[in-house]
Amino acid sequence: MRDFHLPGRSAVYGKNGMVATSNPLSSKVAIQILEAGGNAVDAAIAAAVLQGLLEPQMTGIGGDCFILLSPAGSEEIIALNGSGRAPAALNATDIRAAGHSIVPTGGVESITLPGAIDAFCKLSNDYGKLGLKSSLAPAIHYMKAGVPIAPRTAFDWSLAVDNLKGLARDFYLLKGKPPTAGQMFTAPMQAKVLEEIAQKGRDGFYKGEVAEDMVSSLNALGGVHSLDDFSNV
């Protein structure tokens, strides 16, 4: 219950687990995972992947992942760095030769290999209870069914329109315009990617058709990413 004697947020207490995300639907899904017998790892993966649909201007499965966790009944703290490296063929000499003194933040040179999916797979396998398929199921459902866009997300989205290039404009704009607050947004193609991962594990993302599509898109932008880079994440 809200403590009206104090300003700001009240302290929250719970016996079996807590969830905090920036979107109520992500929090709800994570709680449902816990109620279904999952643990914090299962719930965190479910919420994180769903966030890529609810707030794609902030996060997504093409990004990285950093985790601190403490296994139940242990005082040990485990850290996992789920960030990807730069492609093997990228070097500073070529970047300077192209006229850059720093890595251009808006260029293909700044795109590293996505490490989040590899981290999620390892986390689920090593520390989860329900399995990766269960953790990905909520995001797959909502990517097909759609979600209403929150006001703050719509505001951020409108500021990022000029950053969208090529096919990204088809996937992240609605009739050429950013979605407004309350509009439904779906990502059926991303749902297919998650289904591949649910079926094949990390190989569904870092090998085969999905990896080939990412490499092709990056190469078309001038990137030096390769299939070997992805398979070696």
Model-derived segments and their meaning:
Residues 1-32, 40-207, 211-233:
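Noncatalytic scaffold domains of N-terminal-nucleophile
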